[in-house]
From Swiss-Prot:
This is Acyl carrier protein. It comes from Hydrogenovibrio crunogenus (strain DSM 25203 / XCL-2) (Thiomicrospira crunogena). PANTHER family: ACYL CARRIER PROTEIN, CARRIER DOMAIN-CONTAINING PROTEIN. InterPro entries: ACP, ACP-like_sf, PP-bd_ACP, Ppantetheine_attach_site. The lineage of its organism: Bacteria, Pseudomonadati, Pseudomonadota, Gammaproteobacteria, Thiotrichales. One of its GO terms (molecular function) is acyl carrier activity.
Amino acid sequence: MSSIEERVKKIVVEQLGVEEDQVTADASFIDDLGADSLDTVELVMALEEEFDCEIPDEEAEKISTLAQATSYVEANLD
């Protein structure tokens, strides 16, 4: 697991209040981890803060798993 993926996973665990072993690469934040729309907004905000980046709304809507969040951050880090 990359350090970026570990950091993203830590944020998901903290924001959604789930156990670390529940957060797999393809677990859906909403369907598998019980997040609602507010949770996903707060999750994106936490990712933006952690990685000092801005995630446009149209991109944020596409992020629904750990793998997608990690891929987005890796592709958009300076």
